[in-house]
C-alpha cells in the first residue's frame, strides 16, 4: 500500500524535507513561484515509508509537505471498514 505525498504552494524551496527523507521520495524541481526558484516534488511516492520526517523538517507555519498514510487516506474518503 502506498502513501500519498502532497506538496502545497506554501513551499519556500528550503530543501529541508528533501534532506530529511530517508528513502529519497522527494526532490527539488525548478519553480518560479518562490524566491528560491525551486519547489519540492514527490516523484517516487511508492518508496514512501510513512515516517513523516519531511513534515517534521518543514519550517513553514502551514506544512508545505504532507504525508497521508494509506489508512488515513481511506478513512478521509470514507472507504475504511
UniProtKB/Swiss-Prot annotation:
It catalyses: reduced [plastocyanin] + hnu + oxidized [2Fe-2S]-[ferredoxin] = oxidized [plastocyanin] + reduced [2Fe-2S]-[ferredoxin]. Residues 2-31, 39-68 form the 4Fe-4S ferredoxin-type domain. It is found in: Plastid, Chloroplast thylakoid membrane. Its EC number is 1.97.1.12. It is a peripheral membrane protein. Its main location: plastid. GO terms for biological process: photosynthetic electron transport in photosystem I. Apoprotein for the two 4Fe-4S centers FA and FB of photosystem I (PSI); essential for photochemical activity. FB is the terminal electron acceptor of PSI, donating electrons to ferredoxin. The C-terminus interacts with PsaA/B/D and helps assemble the protein into the PSI complex. Required for binding of PsaD and PsaE to PSI. PSI is a plastocyanin-ferredoxin oxidoreductase, converting photonic excitation into a charge separation, which transfers an electron from the donor P700 chlorophyll pair to the spectroscopically characterized acceptors A0, A1, FX, FA and FB in turn. GO terms for cellular component: chloroplast thylakoid membrane; photosystem I. InterPro entries: 4Fe4S_Fe-S-bd (IPR017896), 4Fe4S_Fe_S_CS (IPR017900), PSI_iron-sulfur_center (IPR050157), PSI_PsaC (IPR017491). Its cofactor is [4Fe-4S] cluster. Keywords: 4Fe-4S, Chloroplast, Electron transport, Iron, Iron-sulfur, Membrane, Metal-binding, Oxidoreductase, Photosynthesis, Photosystem I, Plastid, Repeat, Thylakoid, Transport. [4Fe-4S] cluster 2 binds at residues 21, 48, 51, 54. It comes from the Eukaryota. [4Fe-4S] cluster 1 binds at residues 11, 14, 17, 58. This is Photosystem I iron-sulfur center. The eukaryotic PSI reaction center is composed of at least 11 subunits. SUPFAM superfamilies: 4Fe-4S ferredoxins. It comes from Phalaenopsis aphrodite subsp. formosana. HAMAP family: PSI_PsaC. Binds 2 [4Fe-4S] clusters. Cluster 2 is most probably the spectroscopically characterized electron acceptor FA and cluster 1 is most probably FB. NCBIfam families: PS_I_psaC (TIGR03048). Signal peptide: none annotated.
Amino acid at each position: 500500500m502506498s502513501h500519498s505525498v502532497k506538496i502545497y504552494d506554501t513551499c519556500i524551496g528550503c530543501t529541508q524535507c528533501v534532506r530529511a527523507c530517508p528513502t529519497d521520495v522527494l526532490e527539488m524541481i525548478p519553480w518560479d513561484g518562490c524566491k528560491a526558484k525551486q519547489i519540492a516534488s514527490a516523484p517516487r511516492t511508492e518508496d514512501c515509508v510513512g515516517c513523516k520526517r519531511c513534515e517534521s523538517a518543514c519550517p513553514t507555519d502551514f506544512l508545505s509537505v504532507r504525508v497521508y498514510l494509506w489508512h488515513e487516506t481511506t478513512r478521509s474518503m470514507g472507504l475504511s471498514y
